[in-house]
Regions:
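Non-heme Fe(II)/2-oxoglutarate
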Residues: 1-86
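Arginine residue identity/basic-tract feature
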Residues: 7, 38-41, 99, 109-113
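Pocket-edge structural micro-motifs
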Residues: 12-13, 100-102
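Catalytic core of non-heme Fe(II) oxygenases with the double-stranded beta-helix
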Residues: 87, 92-93, 101-114
């Protein structure tokens, strides 16, 4: 599949199943820590350093997510060489965003992208 022609490419097995499971479990555990800290009032409901629940006006209301999670940032850097090879481009990592979807959650088309 040509990235230049299609403007996208699929990179199969970009990470191992073990690494995918590790990162998924790590993020699920982080959500548990966040939930425990919030329930125990360990930090302010406005604190977002270890994530937050999206509000009613956001893309997926009442869904745990986080910008710049360290595991996701590390994964981004690990995947960069393979993505550069597949696209033929020099890529500059911008940011990571992770979300834990619940049954019934639906991510609609982004309003800020076409």
């Amino acid at each position: 599949m040509s990235f230049k022609k299609n403007k996208y490419t699929v990179i199969k097995q970009a990470i191992s199943k073990d690494l995918a499971a590790f990162v998924a479990n790590y993020f699920l555990m982080q959500k548990q820590v966040y939930d425990t800290c919030r329930q125990s009032r360990y930090f302010s409901p406005f604190e977002t350093i270890i994530g937050y629940y999206e509000g009613e006006n956001e893309q997926i209301p009442n869904t745990y997510s986080q910008y710049a999670n360290m595991a996701m940032e590390t994964l981004l850097l690990k995947c960069q060489p393979g993505m550069e090879k597949a696209t033929g481009l020099k890529l500059y990592p911008a940011y990571t965003y992770a979300r834990i979807y619940k049954k019934g959650d639906e991510l609609k088309r982004h309003k800020d992208r076409f």
